[in-house]
Regions:
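Carboxylate-rich, polar loop motifs that coordinate divalent cations or form catalytic acidic clusters
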Residues: 1-176
Length: 176
């Protein structure tokens, strides 16, 4: 029988915390405050990110995040439901926020992102509510928008709940 000693870390005592794992099995804990605690399971380092104001979280009602770690580039992609996309550059320790603005060029086609996925070429796929997919090309900073139905429709027909890539490179879109 082995015995492991548990160490209580009060900084991780996150009231009503909801825990998610990223693609590297690191932990992300949110609790309805707009703060997200990132725990690197290998190094045990803890980093706290403010992704939304308290007011915005109250309007949205439920924080939803999807996180992708792009190890070769040192980037962490964080999609939010209600506040667009954040990209954290771990080498520079800088955060960039992408949000949607009417009548402007946007890397994201909605602030209400439902899913994020990285493909084998390094592109980022963002599924959104009502606005289809934003396919972000990391290498040339471009964005392509994909709509299952007419892009002018503002209803559930363009809601993308999940994107999955198969081993052969085909991508499947899950809609409402």
């Amino acid at each position: 029988m082995s015995e492991k000693r548990l160490i209580h870390d009060s900084s991780l005592d996150i009231r009503l915390g909801k825990c998610e794992k990223d693609n590297l099995n690191n932990l992300w804990i949110s609790n309805g405050t707009g703060l997200v605690h990132y725990i690197d399971v290998r190094t045990r380092a803890v980093r706290i990110f403010r992704l939304m104001s308290d007011e915005k979280v109250k309007l949205i009602g439920d924080e939803r995040y999807h996180i992708i770690q792009d190890v070769p580039r040192g980037l962490i992609w964080i999609s939010t439901y209600g506040n667009g996309l954040f990209v954290y550059d771990s080498q520079k320790e800088e955060m960039t926020h992408y949000s949607y603005h009417v009548d402007e060029f946007n890397r994201v086609n909605s602030d209400f992102l439902l899913y994020a996925m990285g493909d084998r070429t390094g592109n980022i796929w963002l599924g959104s509510e009502y606005s289809g997919i934003a396919l972000l090309s990391v290498l040339n900073d471009g964005a392509t928008y994909i709509y299952p139905e007419n892009e002018k429709l503002v209803d559930r027909s363009n809601t993308i709940r999940m994107v999955t890539c198969m081993e052969n490179g085909d991508c499947l879109l899950y809609t409402s």
